[in-house]
Amino acid sequence: MAKISKRINKIHEGVDRNKLYDLSAAIGLVKERAVAKFDETVEIAMNLGVDPRHADQMVRGVVNLPNGTGRTVRVAVFARGDKAEEAKKAGADIVGAEELFEIVNGGKIEFDRCIATPDMMPLVGRLGKVLGPRGMMPNPKVGTVTTDVAAAVAASKGGAVEFRVEKAGIIHAGIGKVSFDNAKLEENIKAFADAVIKAKPSAAKGEYVKRVSISSTMGVGVKVDPSTVKVVD
């Protein structure tokens, strides 16, 4: 118990919960307080001035992080014939059509990202109740419904991150690992923030980006001055 208390104290030590840190300082604090015995993910949370209950205020998109995410992404592709072969050659972990549908429909999800060719969507659409809640339903808006399956697989493996605002108006995403250089984390964070800003719906009024914070998997959240992540309304 004493060890746990000591670890918690170390995580919170030196972090002012009411202060807005510039991005560089915030990254340093997060890395210094990552004391878990594994390479923790660095996560960002952005509170947005939108009400996602209204369809015209939904914020979603995809961004290719310049330095990747640091994690191994397992990719499934729904495709037939030549497109299935293209997906396999590009490094997709699972490729199939009706047989893959049966596996997924049975609740066996052994992938992190799902891609489909347009002709497969009548079949894949029937998996909405399985893939939808997990945020894995292929969507042309984020490049996961496409005829260029090779490029989609490469992007998914290379650092493509999907984002979608939650009910409370918050967007969460993993943008790297604690082992990354500070500069690489900063580049990833700025790329992610820029993508979220560009996805601002026209129906959003007033302040768009209200708060930004970063943390590690097991660490404390550090508030970031939005202006230092190039957040401008």
Swiss-Prot record:
State the NCBIfam families in the record: rplA_bact (TIGR01169)
**UniProt GO cellular component terms:** cytosolic large ribosomal subunit
- Protein family per UniProt: Belongs to the universal ribosomal protein uL1 family.
The protein's name is Large ribosomal subunit protein uL1
* Gene behind this protein: rplA
Write down the SUPFAM superfamilies for this protein, in alphabetical order: Ribosomal protein L1
Source species, domain of life: Bacteria
PROSITE patterns from the entry? RIBOSOMAL_L1
- What InterPro entries does the database record attribute to this sequence? Ribosom_uL1_bac-type, Ribosomal_uL1, Ribosomal_uL1-like, Ribosomal_uL1/biogenesis, Ribosomal_uL1_3-a/b-sand, Ribosomal_uL1_CS
Q: Give the keywords, sorted.
A: Repressor, Ribonucleoprotein, Ribosomal protein, RNA-binding, rRNA-binding, Translation regulation, tRNA-binding
- Which molecular function term from Gene Ontology is one that the record holds? tRNA binding
Read off the Gene3D superfamilies from this record.
Answer: 3.30.190.20, 3.40.50.790
Q: Which GO terms describe its biological process?
A: regulation of translation; translation
Q: How does it assemble?
A: Part of the 50S ribosomal subunit.
This chain's function reads: Binds directly to 23S rRNA. The L1 stalk is quite mobile in the ribosome, and is involved in E site tRNA release.
